[in-house]
Regions:
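Outer-membrane beta-barrel signature, preferentially recognizing the C-terminal barrel domain
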Residues: 607, 611-619, 665, 675-738, ...
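Transmembrane beta-barrel wall of Gram-negative outer-membrane proteins
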Residues: 194-418, 422-441, 892
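Gram-negative outer-membrane beta-barrel transporters
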Residues: 740-872, 950
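C-terminal beta-signal and adjacent terminal beta-strands/loops
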Residues: 122, 744-746, 863-869, 890-955
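N-terminal periplasmic "start-of-domain" segments of outer-membrane beta-barrel proteins
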Residues: 36-67, 94, 123-134, 183
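A beta-strand signature from Gram-negative outer-membrane beta-barrel systems
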Residues: 119, 134-186, 229
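N-terminal periplasmic accessory domains that precede
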Residues: 72-75, 79, 100, 113, ...
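Extracytoplasmic beta-strand/coil segments of soluble accessory domains associated
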Residues: 46, 77-122
Length: 955
């Protein structure tokens, strides 16, 4: 229904524009001027950019719209060098709501405001957020269309003492359009130079009077985006095709942008003069979109992707009484297999013991049915053709065909003969509503105070699904498409703000109450249930003599003298087939009795009823903010804020600021402050199971709350920051330069994947985690490491009459450097490198906007410094610096109508390429084994040049 509506509106808009005979102008702003008025940075009266004691950038809606993209995140990145946004081509929910980084910190370290009011965060948690954003849960900025905006104010300074949690890196305030008349309509069509990624957008804005004393301004944007692919065929998939498998997709795995369908967003902003200096206001939004992206390919002829890893990397150094290698729990590999039920690919292809294991489910009599074909029915391995790939493949094909032909055996080739690549789908719905009244009190002890009383509610829901996959544990009974559950984030806020001017001093104080709830809705049963093909602890197992045995194959008598078992899988090493056979012969237990298939929709397991629930936290805050013009040249300010949270307790923070006017054209400014970021309810309570790469192999890892692992409750991050800078107006040239330093302690992030310790297994069991001993890899949120981030921001603008018209130049430069000052015990060296080097240290933009009579042009050059590029969270390289150019040319047909053509990255600058398949991109690993062409963490994206046409009608 939404698709039909979209195209109908698109056609109507095109007709309106084509039929118009009215005159238009297309104004383009080069950047903020020092005289623009902003409300962020102080809780007192609004100030100009020049008078502000902290750095604030002001971006007009025209400047954002000239950036080419209709994605607000990309528009902001082009205008703000200290803001970085990564494409997430193969990821979890981060591909649906992309995180952005201001000043090198995580996306939830920047506070988002709309009309000066706190914006609710998204429900999505970026479990695979590209290093800096791992585990972040920030607001969904992409739902805000630039056509709904009057301007964007970017405070590049810590402001927790004024606004509360999250304002560590800074604050971005989106000011909605408040026009009471006129409007605009825009239709835009574009695609990448490679011929994919077609994007269709229609956007409109309408200003209306609300009686003769108010306004109602409404905006909408509707968008559809086709996917992109920057992929090669995976070598293993190509080998299958070369061997005659006609069911393999080309490419089997896609690296590129996801499909975005029916991306619809509506915003409204209204105000009504009540008389006596009072005004009522309301604003809000409704937004929804469908996202469909790809996951990793599952090869049908090996076990990668339908299992998790286990056993012990040090097993080769320990043996039992029989001389067989055992793990730390005293188990042989076979004993671990039968006890765990979910284990790994024991010998990977390309190793010394080259071969392929195939996981087989016994549906009843499987071993006897194909005994003549297969020596070990559960784990099929051949070494006879190690040096004869064709011979090896022939044996494997024969085994596969025998298993498929047997009614008593099952392998996943039967359902997916060409393998499968799961599709991660989601529906994101976002709503908000804010209402309030402001004015000036005229009676009582607060007479003369301006007041602002408001309440707001915001809700973000992400409904997840996984298509074209399996629940491996269900064997032949598995369906292929799953509804895996939902995340819901609900925020309620109440504010009372007071402000009064006392001669040269502005005094502000306020109260805030918030309630946030993170809710997990369970997925359908098939997405999380344990099927019959997984027997973790079979109660009816017997040995060859008919005597009952435990999960490790021991009788009750044998178990009394056996080692104390403690399943602590801690590695990804090989388990030898001869050990499996020796154990099987010694116990007379057929290994086919224990089928270690993974549980749940594979790739992103559904949320089980055990992990579902609603988790609520409340907090209140009191603040005071004072600014005083001590002399004509010196402005000083101080703010303090106290907050109390129902979860972790209270916190108090302060901020000191100054602005000193050295001359009429030169001013110094500076600030020092403390801040904090409270852990989100999602980070504190979420349970999630998904597939990730570990050393190039797919494995399932589970994210668990830290308190269920015995690691204690999450605590807030704490920060200390200071900044100082210079503001200059030299004729028509305006320059600001600022240095900043931010130290964050006890940063909240996801740990690296690791096997659970014995203590963690005990804690998980006590906390009610089912089958805790079977979890091969886990991670959790923790306060683990400290960072120090410093940098410099320089912004310069110049306007003049040049080239027969008016010309605006702007330059913005950012240097940011982050160091991990305390690594902690759970943060890997690889993650440290990503935290420190995955974002360019230097970024710059140079913009020129030219306006003639009826024609305007916009050109922006973007510079990206060297950075550490990473592929599949597996390996990385030092990427070269790069320059991209964006441009737009606009012709005014009439006073009201214009057409534009433009492009982003018009010279088609490539991202850093992964070495060719014949080369090595990591020690011992061939290149492009996953089919990627570019390192996907490129700050400029991997899709190349994008070209578009746009028609606009203003009225």
């Amino acid at each position: 229904m939404k698709v039909n509506t979209f195209w109908k509106l698109n056609a109507i808009a095109a007709a309106v524009i084509a039929g118009s005979t009215m005159l238009s102008t297309a104004a383009t702003a080069a950047g903020a001027t020092l005289e623009e008025v902003v409300v962020v940075g102080s809780r007192g009266a609004p100030r100009t950019v020049a008078d502000s004691p902290v750095p604030v950038d002001v971006l007009s809606a025209d400047e954002l719209n000239s950036a080419g993209s209709n994605d607000l995140l990309m528009q902001l990145q082009g205008a703000i060098p200290s803001l970085n946004v990564h494409l997430q081509p193969i990821s979890d929910a981060a591909s649906m709501i992309r995180p952005a980084n201001l000043r090198g910190l995580s996306s939830d370290s920047t506070l988002i405001l709309v009309n000066g009011k706190r914006r609710h965060r998204a429900s999505v948690i970026a479990f695979q957020g590209g290093g800096v954003n791992d585990g972040s849960q920030g607001p969904d900025i992409s739902v805000i269309p630039s056509i709904a905006l009057k301007q964007v104010e970017v405070l590049r300074d810590g402001a927790a003492a004024q606004y509360g949690s999250d304002a560590v890196a800074g604050v971005i305030n989106f000011v909605l359009n408040d026009a009471s008349e006129g409007g605009s309509l825009t239709v835009k069509q574009g695609e990448y130079q490679a011929g994919d990624g077609k994007t269709s957008t229609i956007a409109g804005n309408l200003g209306l009077p609300l009686t003769d004393a108010g306004f109602m301004n409404v905006s909408f944007q509707m968008r559809n985006v086709d996917p992109t692919s920057r992929s090669l065929q995976r070598p293993d998939a190509q080998a299958l095709i070369d061997g005659g498998n006609t069911d393999v997709s080309v490419p089997a795995q896609i690296w590129g942008a996801p499909i975005v369908d029916d991306d619809v967003t509506f915003f409204f902003n209204s105000g009504l003069d009540l008389g006596n200096g009072s005004e009522a206001y309301m604003f809000g939004n409704y937004s929804e979109r469908d996202v469909d992206g790809g996951f990793y390919y599952r090869n049908p002829n090996n076990r990668s992707g339908v299992f998790t890893y286990g056993w012990d990397s040090n097993a080769a150094t320990r043996t039992n009484a029989n001389g067989i290698a055992v793990n730390a729990a005293g188990q042989t590999s076979a004993e671990f297999v039968t006890g765990g039920g979910v284990v790994g690919d024991f010998v990977a292809q390309g190793t010394e013991n080259d071969g392929t294991y195939r996981l087989v489910a016994d549906l009843g009599g499987c071993a006897a049915d194909v005994a003549g074909e297969i020596d070990n029915i559960r784990l099929v391995k051949t070494t006879a053709g190690e040096n004869d790939p064709a011979g090896t493949q022939a044996i494997l094909d024969g085994q596969r065909d025998a298993l498929i032909a047997s009614d008593s055996c099952y392998i996943h080739n039967e359902q997916a003969p060409g393998g499968y690549t799961p599709r991660f789908i989601g529906n994101i719905a976002d709503t908000s509503f804010t209402a309030g009244v402001r004015g000036e009190l005229t009676d009582g002890m607060l007479a003369g105070y301006s007041y602002d009383l408001s309440g707001s509610v915001g809700r973000n829901e992400a409904d997840f699904g996984l298509n074209n996959t399996l629940n491996p544990s269900m064997g032949p009974d598995s369906k292929r498409d799953f509804s895996t559950g939902s995340y819901i984030q609900l925020a309620k806020t109440f504010n009372l703000d007071l402000q009064k001017q006392f001669d040269n001093t502005s005094f502000a104080a306020g109260y805030e109450w918030r309630e946030t709830t993170f809710e997990v809705i369970a997925g359908e049963q098939a997405s999380w249930q344990v099927g019959n093909s997984t027997i973790a602890n079979p109660s009816d197992a017997v040995n060859g003599d008919g005597v009952a045995v435990d999960a490790y194959g021991y009788t009750e008598a044998e178990s009394a003298t056996a080692p104390e078992y403690n399943l602590t899988p801690a590695g990804l090493k090989a388990q030898e087939l001869d050990e499996q056979r020796e154990w099987s012969q010694a116990t007379n237990i057929d290994l086919a009795t224990f089928q270690p298939f993974n549980v749940g929709s594979h790739g992103f397991a559904g949320f089980s009823p055990d992990s579902a629930g609603a988790f609520t936290r409340r907090n209140y805050a009191l603040y005071i903010d004072v600014e005083s013009q001590l002399t004509d040249d010196l402005l000083v300010g101080a703010a303090v804020r106290y907050e109390d949270y129902s979860s972790f307790g209270d916190t108090a923070n302060y901020k000191l600021t100054l602005n000193y006017q050295i001359t009429d054209n030169v001013a110094l400014r500076g600030s020092t402050s403390t801040g904090f970021r409270a852990p989100t309810q999602g980070q504190a309570n979420v349970v999630n199971t998904q597939t990730t790469l570990v050393d190039g192999q797919l494995t399932q890892a589970q994210t668990l709350p830290s308190f269920k692992l015995g690691e204690g409750d999450l605590q807030p991050e704490e920060s200390e920051s200071y900044a100082f800078g210079l503001v200059m107006a030299l004729g028509d040239v305006e320059i600001t330069a600022d240095y900043f330093n931010i130290e964050v302690t006890d940063r909240i992030a996801l740990t690296s994947n690791a096997a659970p310790t014995a203590g963690q297994i005990t804690s998980m069991t006590a906390a009610g985690i089912p089958n805790a001993e079977l979890l091969g890899q886990i991670n959790y949120f923790t306060n683990d490491f400290n960072t120090e981030t410093e940098g410099v921001d320089i912004v310069a603008t110049y306007g003049a009459d040049l080239f027969g018209g008016s010309t605006d130049f702007s330059m913005a430069y950012n240097w940011t450097d982050t160091k991990v000052s305390n690594q902690g015990s759970s943060t890997s060296d690889f993650k440290v490198k990503r935290l420190e080097e995955s974002l360019p240290n230097h970024r710059a933009t140079f913009t020129m906007a030219q306006d003639w009579d009826g024609i305007s042009a916009f050109v922006r050059t973007n510079y990206f410094d060297e950075y550490y590029a990473v592929h599949a969270n597996w390996f990385g390289t030092d990427a070269d610096s790069a320059v991209t150019v964006d441009a737009e040319l606009t012709y005014s047909l009439t006073d009201s109508m214009s057409v534009s053509v433009g492009g982003q990255n018009i010279f088609d600058q490539d991202a850093e390429r992964i070495d060719g398949s014949a080369g090595a991109v990591a020690e011992g690993e061939p290149g492009n084994v996953l089919g990627g062409i570019f390192y996907e963490t490129s700050p400029m994206g991997i899709d190349g040049a994008f070209w578009y046409m746009k028609a606009s009608y203003n009225f």
